């Protein structure tokens, strides 16, 4: 059942057209990671290198490019000159293990469309075909349906597993991810009644990784044909803005006030457990649920089920249905009886058999009595949930006593009763009603019904099909459809109006005024049938059949639906589907034959409509976590593969003349989606994708969206709120700015990465302390004697985590060392520049060399500094490629040459004499420069000196590091020899495995040796001297830090904090509405304006004793002077340099191709399967920089060789444990988003745990769900 080696292609569609064609494998340099994984029992893994092809098509209204008949009559709903905005299109192929045994019988096997998007994992599950096995094979089941699990952020990561099909005409009827509040699970319901629940492996230790591409079948059952099978979840505590229009007026309110539900909390609640409800076409309902609370991975959870409860919809059953848990915890089912297809009835499902009848369970209860309906064990839960858990508790106790009743017997004992609570009649066209008795079995009726998931059962959406069903004169012709009608109904409780003849109503009803549920139609719109209903053409891949009969006369015959006899619908009763977004803000209506209409808000404002060629099926889309995008899937029979397309919903595609009209409105709407994702806890990649796509189309500005989020962040009412959302906003902005060329923006991204690293390290250290409150809150306000008198035992670390915490100490020291080094170089540069500017006579005013603070809305142009054209909008074309832009007219050539030399000097590793110069000396006309204003925008860490929160947190953690180093001081005598041996071996291995050391490295090592000799003089005792100069830990590229270096780092930060503590640190002002919006940092506690002389005064006394950063490590990579940002979306078109391309078979070799790819670098890799004629087509990698970034992110091929840390998988530093790993032990997992890697987790199916330490297992289990730096999901490295 488990399958390997999916083959996949990615198509990035550019709506603006163009003739560029690029095609080549894009995942060449990931070959070692994307290779074949070892097959695990009952587990599906990510697999082979996957071919990624860039394809360009001018997107037409029909997604598969099939042109519609120009002669067909059009309607106002169909006239849409703007094609849907496509984020990307993916071609999904089955693995070779499937294709080897697949029989090609397209006229026999069914094609369909089933897709679901997981909000937590950002994973898309899709299926589109049923496959048949060749008769000679026994490898697979006779019929199967491949399920593709795709990560849209990195579509090269795709898992494929097979679901058993019962016939070649079987299909996936329902596919749905579990609610975000529940454990991750995928529900797959086949049309013939086979239901499977797929989950990530959970049996194992606490640090078992949650691999986004590893899935196993946890439970399976069979059931009758259903009209709906779905997850049940309690009412969400959140409400989207559309349901509370007045909330958006208060810009100063918190996001909780904007999005939290204003309804009163009910005492009855529905817990977060896996619960599936099925409503059958026969008119009954059944519940399956997983054991809750779960047994924490020790054994597989047990599943239970109830007996079918009869709805009472009549002998013919129901047409369509939906189920929901209301705000009060009750379960409601809305259904459409076949005997009255224009009426919607709402039933309430309650525990027990109903009518006071007592069920007689078939199971042998012995001395035990089945639980009553009001068990005291589950007080506070909704009655139905308490009833299910009471039976669960009882059945588990029976099993423990050795009694094992069959699933059928136990489910027969758990009965449900259903009673109608309300109903309303939907619209039926008078024309169809008048003719129904003579020409049809029944007239127009409801074909789809759905609850709004966020309104607790008080809002129902309805789709009505207007026309005639089966004609008695020619039943084979099928139904004719004259149109669709979409409605939105709201319910409210109103008092019953009684005639006076019945007396006083309050006296007859126990003093209570009788009430009734009243349904009112709020939206009622008509949608004409699409052109394919009027003149249906058989799909190109279908068999050759006779053309539809020419209509004799009139529109009535022309509108008939003519079915291909080999492509009949699964269920003629289901002609449409309704899909709500998770927050209810958007709704999609999918019609038979692939028409999709998307609406927004409670008034169902049209947003988008498009056509999917799925034949006689319904292409129900799936909304992304924030519903910024939608995903549709179909089967391309010509290419024999599934096609997945992601379409931008917010903002929709707009005509060019309208794209700028509502720019600020769209930017505000996108920002709201980001905040919603952070509050609810779902993935925000779709909002990033739609922002970048809309920015490319000119609808929004990337800088403006970030400015809106910054303004929202700074308007939060408290520091606690900003501490909560600050790191997540850093992650979002880093992801939005991915691939930006502007040097000041890239430096800012590195600053945000440094803040994220510090946040991760701080939380890790706090969780490892025996008493986390022992960390000194503001150490710079404490006098020196108090600091010296602090007992290191007060900050004791859990003994089981001592080895892990040492690696965190190393990372903090690395971060501080790089931060201070950049500040020292920058302060020296500012001082030299200011002195030269004064002596050159370029002006005596401070403003000549002072850039504006970050509070200013628009920058002033300096006279002797790089042109402010650097601050162009991200994503806009710019000709400025270096930091040494041309000076203005007042600058002379020798000043410009000097500036270039100064910038080159500061970028070099030799600091020169300026590094150690006293801050007091220098030109008498020294003009200070504000250090955090972007004066030299390309240098990282400069802005961080003005970040109060970063500076104070780093100082706090450095005190902990200093105490940790001091606590190990007395025992250094015993560890000196082993430490020397370790560092000596490291140095030798580095010399052997690395190229010749660079002069800069020699200078650094010489300086460190000289510094050690200086420290040795004047120190009492040889042993103490050796202890002070012995390096400990594996920081600074493995060479460690001496006691004196740790002390110096701590004292420098203390001095900086003291000197800046008295400065004002206001929150930056909003840039929203400004004409020149720049990308800026956001600040939790506000930002200082720190002068370079203050930095020099703090660094001056310690210049000779500061550690010199060396090599590439987890912290150092963040602040290197590389253009480093972790690569993530190599496939995204904004990083693909040539943009769109085409299919291999459609490729035309033109001069344009070579022009597009003339600047691409093709790695020396053998591209098997690519024709020689395409050799001119280069790789998708846009720049050589991306290759070097990836090497640096993995710690390989960097400027300083890492020697001993080079393993079979390359050099890596584990981002979870912060220790260097060789790749020889454990299983490596990488983050989908930033590609950081770790081997700290336990893998599914592992028989031996490498680390039996329970405390350390808990330590790493904090990050089994996602990367601590960027929040991306884990996938296995193969």
Swiss-Prot record:
Residues 547-557 have a biased composition (Basic and acidic residues). Residues 1-10 have a biased composition (Acidic residues). Disruption phenotype: Late flowering in long days. Very low expression of cold-responsive (COR) genes. It comes from the Eukaryota. GO terms for biological process: abscisic acid-activated signaling pathway; auxin-activated signaling pathway; circadian regulation of gene expression; positive regulation of plant-type cell wall cellulose biosynthetic process; positive regulation of systemic acquired resistance; positive regulation of transcription by RNA polymerase II; regulation of cell wall pectin metabolic process; regulation of DNA-templated transcription. Induction: Not up- or down-regulated by cold. One of its GO terms (molecular function) is transcription coregulator activity. Keywords: Jasmonic acid signaling pathway, Nucleus, Transcription, Transcription regulation. Component of the Mediator complex, a coactivator involved in the regulated transcription of nearly all RNA polymerase II-dependent genes. Mediator functions as a bridge to convey information from gene-specific regulatory proteins to the basal RNA polymerase II transcription machinery. The Mediator complex, having a compact conformation in its free form, is recruited to promoters by direct interactions with regulatory proteins and serves for the assembly of a functional preinitiation complex with RNA polymerase II and the general transcription factors. Component of the Mediator complex. This is Mediator of RNA polymerase II transcription subunit 16. It comes from Arabidopsis thaliana (Mouse-ear cress). The gene is MED16.
């Amino acid at each position: 059942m488990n399958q390997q080696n999916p083959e996949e292609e990615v198509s990035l569609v550019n709506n603006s057209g163009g003739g560029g064609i690029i095609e080549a494998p894009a995942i060449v340099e990931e070959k070692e990671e994307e290779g074949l994984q070892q097959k695990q029992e009952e587990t599906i893994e990510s697999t082979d290198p996957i071919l990624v092809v860039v394809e360009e098509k001018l997107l037409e209204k029909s997604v598969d490019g099939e042109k519609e008949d120009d002669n067909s009559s059009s309607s106002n709903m169909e006239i849409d000159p703007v094609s849907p905005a496509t984020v990307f299109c993916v071609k999904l192929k089955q693995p070779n293990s499937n294709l080897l045994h697949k029989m090609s019988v397209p006229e026999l096997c069914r094609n369909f469309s089933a897709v679901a998007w997981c909000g937590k994992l950002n994973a898309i599950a899709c299926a589109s075909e049923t496959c048949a096995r060749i008769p000679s094979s026994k490898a697979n089941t006779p019929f199967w349906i491949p399920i593709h699990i795709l990560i849209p952020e990195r579509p090269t990561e795709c898992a494929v597993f097979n679901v058993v099909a019962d016939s070649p005409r079987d299909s996936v009827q329902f596919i749905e991810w579990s609610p975000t509040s529940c454990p991750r699970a995928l529900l797959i319901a086949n049309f013939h009644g086979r239901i499977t629940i797929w989950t990530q492996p959970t049996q194992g230790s606490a640090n078992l990784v949650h691999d986004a591409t590893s899935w196993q079948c946890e439970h399976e059952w069979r059931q009758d044909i259903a009209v709906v099978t779905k997850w049940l979840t309690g009412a969400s505590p959140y409400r989207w803005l559309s349901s509370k229009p007045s909330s958006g007026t208060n810009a100063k309110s918190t996001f909780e006030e904007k999005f939290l539900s204003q309804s009163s909390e009910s005492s009855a609640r529905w817990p977060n457990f896996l619960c599936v409800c099925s409503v059958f076409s026969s008119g009954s309902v059944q519940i399956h649920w997983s054991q809750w609370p779960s047994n924490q991975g020790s054994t597989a959870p047990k599943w239970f089920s109830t007996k079918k409860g009869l709805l009472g919809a009549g002998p013919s059953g129901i047409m369509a249905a939906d189920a929901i848990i209301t705000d009060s915890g009750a379960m409601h089912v809305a259904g459409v009886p076949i005997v009255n297809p224009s009426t919607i009835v709402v039933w309430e499902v309650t525990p027990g058999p109903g009518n006071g009848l007592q069920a007689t369970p078939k199971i042998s209860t012995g001395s035990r009595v089945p639980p009553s309906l009001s068990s005291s064990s589950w007080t506070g839960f909704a009655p139905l949930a308490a009833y299910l858990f009471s039976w669960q508790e009882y059945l588990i106790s029976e099993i423990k006593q050795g009694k094992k009743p069959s699933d059928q017997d136990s489910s027969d004992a758990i009965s449900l009763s259903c009673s109608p609570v309300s109903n309303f009649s939907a619209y039926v066209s008078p024309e169809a009603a008048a003719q129904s008795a003579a020409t049809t079995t029944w007239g127009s009726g409801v074909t789809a019904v759905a609850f709004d998931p966020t309104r607790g059962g008080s809002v129902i959406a309805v789709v009505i099909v207007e026309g005639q069903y089966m004609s008695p004169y020619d039943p084979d012709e099928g139904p004719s459809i004259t149109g669709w009608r979409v409605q939105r109904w709201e319910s409210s409780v109103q008092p019953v109006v009684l005639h006076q003849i019945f007396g006083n109503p309050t006296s007859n009803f126990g003093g209570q005024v009788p009430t009734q549920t009243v349904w009112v139609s709020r939206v009622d719109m008509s949608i004409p049938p699409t052109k394919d209903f009027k003149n249906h053409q058989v799909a190109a891949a279908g068999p050759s059949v006779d053309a539809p009969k020419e209509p004799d006369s009139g529109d009535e015959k022309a509108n008939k639906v003519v079915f291909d006899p080999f492509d009949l619908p699964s269920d003629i009763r289901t002609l449409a589907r309704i899909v709500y977004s998770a927050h209810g803000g958007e709704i999609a209506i999918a019609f038979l034959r692939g028409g999709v209409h998307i609406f927004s808000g409670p008034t169902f404002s049209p947003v988008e409509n498009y056509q999917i060629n799925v034949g006689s099926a319904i292409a129900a889309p799936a909304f992304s976590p924030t519903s910024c995008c939608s995903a549709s899937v179909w089967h391309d029979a010509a290419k024999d593969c599934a096609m997945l397309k992601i379409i931008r919903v917010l903002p929709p595609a707009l005509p060019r003349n309208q794209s700028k009209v509502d720019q600020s409105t769209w930017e505000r709407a996108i920002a709201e989606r980001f905040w919603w994702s952070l509050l609810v806890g779902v993935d925000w990649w779709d909002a990033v994708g739609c922002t970048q796509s809309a920015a490319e189309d000119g609808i929004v500005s990337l800088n403006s969206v970030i400015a809106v989020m910054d303004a929202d962040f700074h308007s939060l009412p408290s520091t606690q709120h900003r501490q909560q959302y600050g790191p997540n906003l850093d992650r979002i902005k880093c992801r939005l700015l991915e691939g930006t060329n502007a040097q000041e923006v890239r430096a800012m991204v590195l600053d945000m990465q440094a803040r994220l690293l510090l946040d991760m390290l701080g939380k890790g250290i706090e969780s490892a302390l025996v008493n986390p409150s022992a960390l000194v809150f503001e150490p710079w306000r404490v006098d020196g004697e108090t600091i010296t008198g602090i007992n290191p035992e007060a900050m004791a670390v859990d003994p089981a985590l001592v080895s892990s915490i040492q690696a965190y100490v190393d990372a903090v020291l690395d971060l501080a060392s790089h931060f201070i080094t950049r500040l020292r170089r920058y302060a020296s540069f500012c001082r030299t520049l200011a002195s030269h500017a004064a002596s050159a006579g370029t002006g005596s005013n401070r403003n000549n060399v002072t850039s504006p603070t970050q509070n200013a809305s628009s920058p002033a142009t300096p006279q002797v500094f790089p042109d402010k054209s650097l601050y162009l909008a991200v994503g806009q074309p710019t000709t400025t490629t270096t930091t040494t832009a041309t000076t203005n007219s007042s600058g002379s050539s020798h000043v410009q040459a000097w500036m270039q030399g100064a910038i080159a000097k500061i970028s070099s590793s030799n600091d020169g004499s300026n590094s150690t110069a006293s801050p007091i000396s220098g030109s008498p006309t020294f003009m200070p420069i504000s250090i955090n204003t972007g004066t030299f925008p390309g240098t990282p860490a400069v802005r961080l000196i003005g970040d109060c929160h970063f500076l104070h947190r780093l100082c706090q953690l450095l005190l902990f590091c200093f105490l940790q180093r001091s606590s190990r001081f007395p025992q250094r005598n015993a560890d000196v020899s082993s430490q020397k041996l370790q560092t000596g071996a490291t140095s030798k291995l580095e010399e052997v495995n690395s190229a010749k050391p660079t002069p800069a490295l020699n200078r650094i090592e010489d300086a460190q040796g000289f510094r050690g000799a200086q420290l040795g003089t004047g120190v009492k005792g040889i042993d103490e001297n050796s202890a002070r100069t012995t390096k400990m830990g594996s920081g600074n590229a493995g060479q460690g830090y001496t006691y004196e270096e740790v002390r110096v780092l701590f004292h420098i930060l203390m001095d900086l904090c003291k000197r800046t503590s008295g400065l004002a640190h206001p929150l930056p002002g909003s840039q929203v509405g400004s004409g020149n919006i720049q990308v800026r940092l956001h600040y939790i506690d506000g930002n200082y304006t720190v002068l370079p002389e203050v930095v020099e005064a703090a660094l001056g006394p310690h210049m000779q004793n500061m550690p010199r950063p060396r090599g590439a490590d987890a912290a150092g990579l963040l602040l290197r002077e590389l253009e480093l940002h972790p690569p993530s979306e190599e496939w995204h078109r904004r990083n693909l340099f040539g943009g769109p391309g085409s299919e291999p078979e459609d490729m035309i070799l033109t001069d344009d191709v070579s022009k597009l790819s003339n600047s691409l670098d093709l790695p020396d890799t053998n591209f098997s399967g690519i024709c020689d004629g395409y050799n001119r087509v280069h790789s998708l990698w846009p720049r050589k920089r991306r290759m070097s970034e990836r090497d640096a992110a993995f710690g390989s091929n960097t400027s300083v060789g890492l020697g001993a840390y080079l393993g079979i998988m390359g050099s890596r530093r584990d981002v979870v444990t912060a220790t260097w790993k060789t790749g020889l032990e454990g299983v490596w997992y990488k983050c989908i988003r930033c590609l950081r890697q770790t081997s700290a987790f336990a893998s599914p199916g592992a028989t031996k745990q490498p680390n039996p330490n329970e405390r350390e297992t808990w330590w790493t289990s904090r990050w089994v769900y996602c990367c601590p730096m960027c929040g991306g999901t884990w996938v296995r490295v193969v």
